[in-house]
Amino acid sequence: MEALVYTFLLVGTLGIIFFAIFFREPPKLPEASKSKK
């Protein structure tokens, strides 16, 4: 049962890191990069 929890945490951490890198550098919208708030 503990292995399942550790696996879930590992997948969750990898998912968070993946999304963080993906949203950090958007593949499109070069114009939005110019108009920064």
Curated annotation (Swiss-Prot):
One of its GO terms (cellular component) is photosystem II reaction center. Keywords: Chloroplast, Membrane, Photosynthesis, Photosystem II, Plastid, Thylakoid, Transmembrane, Transmembrane helix. It is a single-pass membrane protein. InterPro entries: PSII_PsbT (IPR001743), PSII_PsbT_sf (IPR037268). The chain crosses the membrane at residues 3-23. It comes from the Eukaryota. Pfam families: PsbT. It is found in: Plastid, Chloroplast thylakoid membrane. One of its GO terms (biological process) is photosynthesis. Belongs to the PsbT family. Found at the monomer-monomer interface of the photosystem II (PS II) dimer, plays a role in assembly and dimerization of PSII. PSII is a light-driven water plastoquinone oxidoreductase, using light energy to abstract electrons from H(2)O, generating a proton gradient subsequently used for ATP formation. PSII is composed of 1 copy each of membrane proteins PsbA, PsbB, PsbC, PsbD, PsbE, PsbF, PsbH, PsbI, PsbJ, PsbK, PsbL, PsbM, PsbT, PsbY, PsbZ, Psb30/Ycf12, at least 3 peripheral proteins of the oxygen-evolving complex and a large number of cofactors. It forms dimeric complexes. This is Photosystem II reaction center protein T. It comes from Spirogyra maxima. The gene is psbT.
